[in-house]
C-alpha cells in the first residue's frame, strides 16, 4: 500500500483513469479500474518516485501534463527537515498519446518537485496557458503549452516559497496555497503557510489573510456558483492537549473573513465540491473517517464504512455518481458508495488494485 494524491479521468474516456502515487509513480487503467499499468515511459528516473498531479487538455484528446518528483510525501516536514527543497528533483512532463509515453517539458523551470499543474481552459488551443507549483521555488507560468516556463513570484514572500496548490475561480482569479514550513509547536510567522490571490493571471500576487490562528493551509476550493465563496482546508498545529486551528473554513467575501465549519483539531487535506450539486461537500480526515455535507458544510455526516486512519482526498466517480474514490496516506485508493452504508460494521470500500495488464 502507498500514498496517493489523486484519481483523474480522461475527459474523452471516463474509463481511462490515472492514479497519482508516491514511491511507484503514475499508474493508468484503460478499463475503468479493472486492471492497471505503470505510465512512466519517458519520465526521467530521478523524477519517477511520485506523481503529484495530472492535467488534461479538454479540447485535444491524448494531450496531458504531469507534475513529477523524486521526493514523496510533500508537504510533510519530514521530507525537507534536513535539506533544502531546492535540492529535490522533478519537473513537468507532457504526453500526446494519453500517457503511453512522456517527454520532459521543463525549459525555464529548474529541476524541482512540481506538486501541482493547472490549465487555463480559456487559453488558445495549441498554445495553452499552464501554471505549475514548484515546491521551494514558487509559481511558474507557460503560455506555449509547457514548452517554456517563467517564474511568477511577484508579491510572494520568502526565498523558498513552498508553492503547493493553485486554484482558479469562475471570475478568473487565481489562488495559491503555500504550505507551512514550521513543525512541532514552533509556528513563527516566517514558518507559517499562506494564501495568495492574483487577478492578473499570476503577474502579481496579494496576500489573503488566513483564518485566525491557522498556519497550515492545505487546499482551497471555490464554489462554482459564487467566486467569493471559498473553502479552505488546514492541518492543525500541535497544542497542549490536542491539535488546534485545523479543519475546514469558509469565506463568503473572498477571504476577508472566515468561519470554521469542522473540528479544528483535525488534519484535513482537501475538500471536494460536487459540481452537479455544489451544496454537497466531501472531506477526509486523520480520524479513520470521511465526511459528507449536503448543506454547504453546516452539518457533516460520517461516510459509514470507510475507516482507514489517514484519509486524504475524496474524488467523485464520473462513471457512477453514487460512488466515490478516497485517496489515503499509506492505504492506497478506496472506492465505494458516496453516502456510505448505514449497515456496515467495518469497511464497505474496496481498495483499487494496482496490477499490470
Which residues are covered by each model-predicted region?
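Extracellular glycan-interacting surfaces
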Residues: 1-357
Amino acid at each position: 500500500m502507498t500514498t496517493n494524491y489523486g484519481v483523474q479521468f480522461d475527459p474523452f474516456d471516463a474509463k481511462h483513469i490515472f492514479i497519482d502515487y508516491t514511491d511507484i509513480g503514475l499508474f493508468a487503467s484503460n478499463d475503468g479500474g479493472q486492471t492497471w499499468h505503470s505510465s512512466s515511459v519517458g519520465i526521467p528516473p530521478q523524477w519517477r518516485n511520485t506523481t503529484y498531479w495530472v492535467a488534461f487538455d479538454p479540447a485535444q484528446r491524448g494531450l496531458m501534463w504531469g507534475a513529477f518528483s523524486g521526493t514523496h510525501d510533500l508537504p510533510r516536514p519530514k521530507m525537507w527537515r534536513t535539506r533544502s527543497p531546492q535540492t529535490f528533483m522533478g519537473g513537468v512532463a507532457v504526453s500526446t498519446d494519453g500517457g503511453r509515453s512522456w517527454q520532459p517539458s521543463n525549459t525555464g523551470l529548474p529541476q524541482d518537485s512540481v506538486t501541482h499543474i493547472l490549465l487555463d481552459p480559456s487559453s488558445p488551443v495549441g498554445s495553452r496557458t499552464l501554471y505549475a507549483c514548484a515546491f521551494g521555488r514558487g509559481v511558474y507560468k507557460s503560455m506555449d503549452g509547457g514548452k517554456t516556463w517563467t517564474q511568477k513570484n511577484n508579491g510572494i514572500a520568502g526565498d523558498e516559497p513552498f508553492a503547493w496548490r493553485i486554484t482558479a475561480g469562475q471570475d478568473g482569479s487565481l489562488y495559491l496555497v503555500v504550505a507551512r514550513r514550521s513543525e512541532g509547536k514552533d509556528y513563527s510567522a516566517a514558518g507559517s503557510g499562506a494564501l495568495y490571490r492574483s487577478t492578473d493571471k499570476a503577474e502579481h500576487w496579494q496576500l489573503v489573510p488566513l483564518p485566525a490562528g491557522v498556519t497550515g493551509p492545505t487546499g482551497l476550493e471555490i464554489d462554482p456558483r459564487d467566486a467569493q465563496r471559498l473553502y479552505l482546508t488546514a492541518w492543525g498545529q500541535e497544542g497542549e492537549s490536542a491539535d488546534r486551528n485545523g479543519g475546514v473554513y469558509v469565506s463568503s467575501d473572498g477571504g476577508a473573513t472566515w468561519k470554521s465549519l469542522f473540528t479544528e483539531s483535525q488534519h484535513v487535506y482537501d475538500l471536494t465540491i460536487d459540481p452537479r450539486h455544489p451544496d454537497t461537500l466531501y472531506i477526509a480526515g486523520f480520524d479513520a473517517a470521511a465526511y459528507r455535507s449536503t448543506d454547504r458544510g453546516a452539518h457533516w455526516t460520517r461516510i459509514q464504512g470507510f475507516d482507514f486512519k489517514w484519509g486524504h482526498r475524496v474524488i467523485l466517480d464520473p462513471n457512477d455518481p453514487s460512488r466515490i474514490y478516497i485517496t489515503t496516506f499509506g492505504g492506497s485508493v478506496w472506492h465505494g458508495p458516496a453516502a456510505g452504508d448505514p449497515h456496515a460494521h467495518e469497511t464497505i470500500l474496496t481498495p483499487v488494485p494496482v496490477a499490470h495488464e
